[in-house]
């Protein structure tokens, strides 16, 4: 038992603060290495433009692919053994893998370690499950919205810090620094997260069929998983072409990388500001209204992005898009809380993470394919169509949920 654990009631607000810090540290740790990932691939012996692009894409995507496979297993284990244990397992496991990445000698070793990183991940979904099972239901939207800003903040600061560290100390030391950040996350979680959890034997665990039947509305929960996937597809589809699109808009300027970095970052800043506020509003008026409104608002912003003429116009639209995006995943997570029990929260949030990871893999592939065949501007129009489908699909699923309530 950690020093912070005793017989006193759990202070969920303190747990929220510590979990936020953990999500911030893991978000920063994951994104620290992103700016120079292709450079490290090249350092490991990959040469040639096409080979470098291919391997960079593979080592980036494989982490999400293996995370989507492993998440349900870790979610089930969290429901059996406790969410805090899964937070500790994830932070320590990822820290060890980061050290090994810094020692990799060839691309195959690095590829295997990136896959292992995905297998051992899962800090954020388990943090979501932990907080969701402790926070009062009428504060779920605010709490999960606030928690989401931890990972966003870390992901925003990570690339800047990673780039500076790589320039100052070289590529390999950044992996060791990242590992130390994850180990710090491990100790913060160990000593300051409290959870009263009664372990459940494997025989007493609900099987998949029982998990489904225990849900208040299984079809709605599945539709929320699909909504999460589409949100990530829409977000990821723009990532591969953003820098090239900015270069096309900016023309012959010397600081395209800086401008692209700023435009890539502004949605995260906006989400950071909007997520807790819109989460709190969702607690008052209903997360389903926030979800549908934010999706429609996103469509209305994506369409004009295809017609902008300057980087400034694109940056303003992406800032507004980030404000809407900051409400989407917390609204989905709040609806999942409303429609599942604490007994299966770990698995529900992990299944949702699997769909999110699949979206992280397929989104960039979709964006790259569309831009290669139809140009950069078409990506925004197709993405707007995908999000519009998501809005209609989500509205229909949520509307069907309300019909029985009215008839009853």
From Swiss-Prot:
CDD domains tied to this protein: MFS_MdtG_MDR_like
Q: Which domain of life is it from?
A: Bacteria
Gene Ontology annotations of biological process type: response to antibiotic
Subcellular localization, as worded in the UniProt entry:
Cell inner membrane
Q: Which GO terms describe its molecular function?
A: transmembrane transporter activity
* Pfam families per UniProt: MFS_1
Which ranges does the record mark as transmembrane?
16-36, 58-78, 92-112, 115-135, 146-166, 173-193, 224-244, 256-276, 290-310, 319-339, 378-398
| Gene3D superfamilies referenced in this protein's UniProt entry, alphabetically | MFS general substrate transporter like domains (1.20.1250.20)
InterPro entries per record: MFS, MFS_dom, MFS_MdtG_subfamily, MFS_trans_sf, Mutidrug-R_MdtG, Tet-R_TetA/multi-R_MdtG-like
Matching entries from SUPFAM superfamilies are given as: MFS general substrate transporter (SSF103473)
- Tell me if Membrane is a UniProt keyword of this record: yes
Q: How does this chain sit within the bilayer?
A: Multi-pass membrane protein
One GO cellular component term of this record is: plasma membrane
User: Keyword annotations for this protein?
Assistant: Antibiotic resistance, Cell inner membrane, Cell membrane, Membrane, Transmembrane, Transmembrane helix, Transport
Q: What is its main location?
A: membrane
Report the PANTHER family cross-referenced here.
MULTIDRUG RESISTANCE PROTEIN MDTG (PTHR43414:SF6)
Which family does the record claim for this protein?
A: Belongs to the major facilitator superfamily. DHA1 family. MdtG (TC 2.A.1.2.20) subfamily.
Query: What role does this protein play?
Result: Confers resistance to fosfomycin and deoxycholate.
Its name, as the record gives it, is Multidrug resistance protein MdtG
Organism listed in the record:
Escherichia coli (strain 55989 / EAEC)
Q: Which gene encodes it?
A: mdtG
């Amino acid at each position: 038992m950690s020093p912070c654990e005793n017989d006193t009631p759990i202070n969920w607000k303190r747990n929220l603060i510590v979990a936020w810090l953990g999500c911030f540290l893991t978000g920063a740790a994951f994104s620290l290495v992103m700016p120079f990932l292709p450079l490290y691939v090249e350092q490991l012996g990959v040469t040639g433009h096409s080979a470098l692009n291919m391997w960079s894409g593979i080592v980036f995507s494989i982490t999400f692919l293996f995370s989507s496979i492993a998440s349900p297993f870790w979610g089930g284990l969290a429901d059996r053994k406790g969410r805090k244990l899964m937070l500790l397992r994830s932070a320590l496991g990822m820290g060890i893998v980061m050290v090994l990445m810094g020692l990799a000698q060839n691309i195959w070793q690095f590829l295997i370690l990136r896959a292992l990183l995905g297998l051992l991940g899962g800090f954020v979904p388990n943090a979501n499950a932990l907080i969701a099972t402790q926070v009062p239901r009428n504060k779920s939207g605010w709490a999960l919205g606030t928690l989401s800003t931890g990972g966003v903040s870390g992901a925003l600061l990570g690339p800047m810090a990673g780039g500076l560290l790589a320039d100052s100390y070289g590529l390999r030391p950044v992996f060791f620094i990242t590992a130390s950040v994850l180990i710090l996350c491990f100790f913060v979680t160990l000593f300051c997260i409290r959870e009263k959890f009664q372990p459940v034997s494997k025989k007493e665990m609900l099987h998949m069929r029982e998990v489904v039947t225990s849900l208040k509305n299984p079809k709605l929960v599945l539709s929320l998983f699909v909504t999460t996937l589409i949100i990530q597809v829409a977000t990821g589809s723009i990532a591969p072409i953003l820098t090239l699109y900015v270069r096309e808009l900016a023309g012959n300027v010397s600081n395209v990388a800086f401008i692209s970095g700023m435009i890539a970052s502004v949605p995260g800043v906006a989400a950071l500001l909007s997520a807790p506020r819109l989460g709190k509003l969702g607690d008052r008026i209903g997360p389903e209204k926030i979800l549908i409104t934010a999706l429609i608002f996103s469509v209305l912003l994506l369409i004009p992005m295809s017609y902008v003429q300057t980087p400034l116009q694109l940056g303003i639209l992406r800032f507004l898009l980030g404000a809407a995006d900051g409400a989407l995943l917390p609204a989905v997570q709040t609806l999942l809380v409303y429609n599942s029990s604490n007994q299966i929260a770990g698995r529900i949030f992990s299944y949702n993470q699997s769909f999110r990871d699949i979206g992280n893999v397929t989104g960039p592939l979709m964006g790259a394919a569309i831009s290669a065949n139809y140009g950069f501007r078409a990506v925004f129009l197709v993405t707007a169509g995908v999000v519009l489908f998501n809005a209609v699909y989500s509205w229909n699923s949520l509307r069907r949920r309300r019909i029985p309530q009215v008839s009853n």
